[in-house]
Amino acid sequence: MAAKDVKFGNDARVKMLRGVNVLADAVKVTLGPKGRNVVLDKSFGAPTITKDGVSVAREIELEDKFENMGAQMVKEVASKANDAAGDGTTTATVLAQAIITEGLKAVAAGMNPMDLKRGIDKAVTAAVEELKALSVPCSDSKAIAQVGTISANSDETVGKLIAEAMDKVGKEGVITVEDGTGLEDELDVVEGMQFDRGYLSPYFINKPETGAVELESPFILLADKKISNIREMLPVLEAVAKAGKPLVIIAEDVEGEALATLVVNTMRGIVKVAAVKAPGFGDRRKAMLQDIATLTGGTVISEEIGMELEKATLEDLGQAKRVVINKDTTTIIDGVGEEAAIQGRVGQIRKQIEEATSDYDREKLQERVAKLAGGVAVIKVGAATEVEMKEKKARVDDALHATRAAVEEGVVAGGGVALVRVAAKLAGLTAQNEDQNVGIKVALRAMEAPLRQIVSNAGEEPSVVTNNVKAGEGNYGYNAATEEYGNMIDFGILDPTKVTRSALQYAASVAGLMITTECMVTDLPKGDAPDLXAAGMGG
């Protein structure tokens, strides 16, 4: 086993604080409308330029093992805030640094670390309740656009795009961010349900100019099996031909004689048909077929429940206003399924989302909800260079998470004002003993840190601005972008409550652990390990 280097008490804490400061100082230059960029070197290709706190934090590794432990613990704060709310990583880092710095000063002055931690925890719990009381719902698209703008580092076009996307696909809809091809940002909205499976034969194409199959008011046959024998399908095909409508077949696969017969029928104009493979694999395919059945008012023909394809009637088929199929995707527009059944199915999937353990499963389930409930919007980010594209895409992603968080838990005044107001309200808070009271003061003083940092990055004097903001009331604050005071809500400077809450909770959690650290252990570098004495001769 490798030899260890052990540090105790103040020696350990000083090293740890140095690591915290290196990481936090690198991250906090990005805070606020006048935050600066950080350039990250890559082992290959162009360097990355970013204003995203968590991206900066993830890049930092320090040579000194003890300092590195401090830095890694604060990195955890940024990552956790990012996972919970998708934004607020820089705010969380600034808060953590402030609580740790003040807390370690108190420990050095002889306070009991455990009591300090209890005081900090009490202040944070009370602050979270106050934040909830200050929070106002974020429902109209103007507020959504403002939240998106602030989170994308004051880029108004991004805020407007996200608000427009949410308008189109609803609050539950899926919004994805992709690389664009031009210089301008674009928004593509896919209404209805779309899945990644195209036509099984190009002979089904009836719109050669677009290379797509477009069928108006078709019947939709859903089968959880491979179809290779045309005899199984004859009754359904005859019924559909009599009804004079087109038919879309969504099955595990359609092959051989069955596919050939469908192609011949289509080319001769006897019955318009298009066949596609069902989306997904295994159990997920069964679930997605059931989703399509709910949306179109049809039934999945599955041998598992004793249904046979030969016995299927028009009653078992789903219907939609229009189906568009191209090489890679199928879109079902305006299925005739009952609203109550669709909502029931959405509720069922939401329950599964709550119980899902892996992020991948949760993401797939959320996609299914979106496809049933609204639609899918794609924001295509435009930029002049690859480097700018990456930076902008990261900002749009942040803004998207922030707006989702705002819709979920509401918004508070931005620019660090909400935390200053909360700290003022809790000024009279006391605990069981003097050391715990100091812990409360440490947390309340730290709540001013984000405002101070925003002002500092804007090149103003933090103490003067902080005192002016404290002298005001309600949403009165400082707009660092225009360097004026006023109502933050009127300025359109809003922060999602969830982002502010998560930043404070995670910062306090890790800071509390670091304040109560008394010993640090790390491996000695190989060269520093004590040499073993040469073995003597046996006597």
Curated annotation (Swiss-Prot):
Reaction(s) this enzyme catalyzes, per UniProt: ATP + H2O + a folded polypeptide = ADP + phosphate + an unfolded polypeptide
Q: What's any GO biological process attached to this entry?
A: protein refolding
Please provide, alphabetically and separated by semicolons, the GO molecular function terms listed in this UniProt record: ATP binding; ATP-dependent protein folding chaperone; isomerase activity
**Enzyme class, UniProt record, top EC level:** isomerase
Q: Cross-referenced NCBIfam families, in alphabetical order?
A: GroEL (TIGR02348), PRK00013.1 (NF000592), PRK12849.1 (NF009487), PRK12850.1 (NF009488), PRK12851.1 (NF009489)
Family to which the UniProt record says this protein belongs:
Belongs to the chaperonin (HSP60) family.
Output this protein's name. Answer: Chaperonin GroEL
